[in-house]
Amino acid sequence: MKRIILDIQSGLYARTIQRMLLQELEEYHIIISESPSKTVERCKMFRPYALLMEVTGYTPWMLEEQLAIREAVARNNPDCKVVMLVDDAADKALAESVKQAKRDGLIDAFLFGSVTEQYMAAVMDSL
């Protein structure tokens, strides 16, 4: 069974994504990290296939902070795929920075908040 860790700002949004992924993907275990400060610990414990991290303009979900978490996760689990979720409608500059992180090879994929549930699940399944 593959595991995905969610590092999402809103607990309600995290649970919504969790339920959606469980409906769309078979044989996956979706685990919510309560806060970015616990994400590295969760990744050590569960050794996920992928980490889906939200990026916002607010600490502790800022791009630089999430990239630091990504680096710590990679030291312990170099095979873990990292996907960043950004609200492209709310912050176009941040969305462009996340795209640049993908171009630079710092993350494996990115998703805009406006994607469909099926597309999000397909991306997570295809890493």
Per-region residue spans from a language model:
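Non-catalytic signal-transmission and effector/linker regions of two-component phosphorelay proteins
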Residues: 1-19, 115-127
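Two-component/phosphorelay signaling modules centered on CheY-like receiver
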Residues: 11-33
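Short, aromatic/basic amphipathic alpha-helical patches
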Residues: 17-21, 68-69, 94-103
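Acidic, metal-coordinating helix/loop segments flanking the phosphotransfer/catalytic sites
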Residues: 34-50, 58-60
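Two-component signal transduction core modules
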Residues: 51, 82, 109-110
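Conserved phosphotransfer microenvironments
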Residues: 51-75, 86-89, 94-97
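His-Asp phosphorelay/catalytic-motif detector in bacterial-type signaling
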Residues: 75-81
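Output/docking surface of receiver
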Residues: 86-127
